[in-house]
Amino acid sequence: MNRASAVFLDRDGIINRAIVRDGKPYPPVRMQDFEILPGSVTALSQLADFGYTLIGITNQPDVARGTQSREMVESFNALIQSKLPVREIFVCYHDNADDCNCRKPRPGLILQAAQKYQLDLSNSWMVGDRWKDIAAGQAAGLKTIFVDYHYSETYQGSPATYIVEETFSIAPIILKGSK
């Protein structure tokens, strides 16, 4: 059986707009703050049309911290899946102190998705806007694209395979790499 190639996508900042405060990105808290990025609509449609399986991978520690409800996170994810060709969104609800394997920069969620959907990680990609996204992708053996919004945080780890400044730029890079 042939394994499918996938594009793993961080949620906040890649699929939907992150809320930036003091130079740091945060997930939206209320539905009225939630906005799917226009560039992601175009890019993800192109990738799905080419045959990539699209999977969301997101850390949502605000649930563990008590500042966001799991129901609201699930509502955002359901809205994404109703508007975009994203197969599933895998979520880590743990905080840093929980030391779990699913929280990026560890690759646990990527590996779960790969097993569930029989994905070929050697021909797959991770797209993210923070160093933890890129590190998780690299740990899983993926090619990586860092969408650099110039947040006020230090990039840690190895450089991404590619660096872009907008989500809409990811599709041409990935599709060119597929030929």
Regions found by a protein language model. Give the residues of each.
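Asp-based, Mg2+/Mn2+-dependent phosphohydrolase catalytic module
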Residues: 2-3, 71-88, 97-126, 130-179
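Anionic group-transfer/hydrolysis microenvironments
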Residues: 12, 61, 106
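Conserved protein kinase catalytic core
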Residues: 16-18, 23, 65, 135, ...
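Substrate-recognition element of Asp-dependent hydrolases with the DxDx(T/V) motif
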Residues: 40-73, 77, 86-98, 137
